[in-house]
Amino acid sequence: MSGGGTETPVACEAAQGGGGKKRDSLGTAGAAHLIIKDLGEIHSRLLDHRPVTQGEIRYFVKEFEEKRGLRELRVLENLKNMIQETNERMLPKCRETMQGGLEETLQRLQAATDSIHRLQQREQERKKVINDHLTASEKQRMLQWEEFLRGQPQRRAEVDAEHRKAMERLREQYAAMEKDLAKFSTF
């Protein structure tokens, strides 16, 4: 029954061919040992799959490592080719494009800077003219104000004199009107 070598008789076989001795129900210690050994072999054949699974695992790991190693080599080779292509073709093109674009951009930037500088100068000149005009206007207004204040007492005196004359005329007129009214009230 065992798969690896000599077979040992099982308890039933030992009882049949063992002479004529009567055995008890459990049998002898040697027979029990044989039964346990046979049960262990049956158990290992039916239920213990460790040797098979270990072999499969070793095979899977070996295949995986071989395929992975080849895949990594291919990936590294592709990366190397891409880097070489980039260094040989793409990088010079990018440099040329960048140089051309930068020169044009710098020229435009310089032109914009010059025009802004001119605009700032014009604005400063315009502000200076406006400030000069405002300063001159302010000085002129101050002179006019001072002249006005100097002429004010004379004008006030003239107005006061004119007012006094008008008051005198009104008094005389009212006095004359009272006389005329007194003439008419005697009737």
From Swiss-Prot:
GO BP term, pick one: anterograde synaptic vesicle transport
One CC-aspect GO term: BLOC-1 complex
Modified residues annotated as N-acetylserine in this record: S2
Region entry Disordered, spans: 1-27
Keywords: Acetylation
Short name of one Pfam family: Muted
InterPro entries: Bloc1s5 (IPR017243)
Task of the protein: Component of the BLOC-1 complex, a complex that is required for normal biogenesis of lysosome-related organelles (LRO), such as platelet dense granules and melanosomes. In concert with the AP-3 complex, the BLOC-1 complex is required to target membrane protein cargos into vesicles assembled at cell bodies for delivery into neurites and nerve terminals. The BLOC-1 complex, in association with SNARE proteins, is also proposed to be involved in neurite extension. Plays a role in intracellular vesicle trafficking.
Similarity field: Belongs to the BLOC1S5 family.
Subunit structure: Octamer composed of one copy each BLOC1S1, BLOC1S2, BLOC1S3, BLOC1S4, BLOC1S5, BLOC1S6, DTNBP1/BLOC1S7 and SNAPIN/BLOC1S8. The BLOC-1 complex associates with the AP-3 protein complex and membrane protein cargos. Interacts with BLOC1S4, BLOC1S6, DTNBP1/BLOC1S7 and PI4K2A. Component of the biogenesis of lysosome-related organelles complex 1 (BLOC-1) composed of BLOC1S1, BLOC1S2, BLOC1S3, BLOC1S4, BLOC1S5, BLOC1S6, DTNBP1/BLOC1S7 and SNAPIN/BLOC1S8.
PANTHER family, per the entry: BIOGENESIS OF LYSOSOME-RELATED ORGANELLES COMPLEX 1 SUBUNIT 5 (PTHR31784:SF2)
Listed name of the protein: Biogenesis of lysosome-related organelles complex 1 subunit 5
Protein's organism: Rattus norvegicus (Rat)
Protein encoded by which gene: Bloc1s5
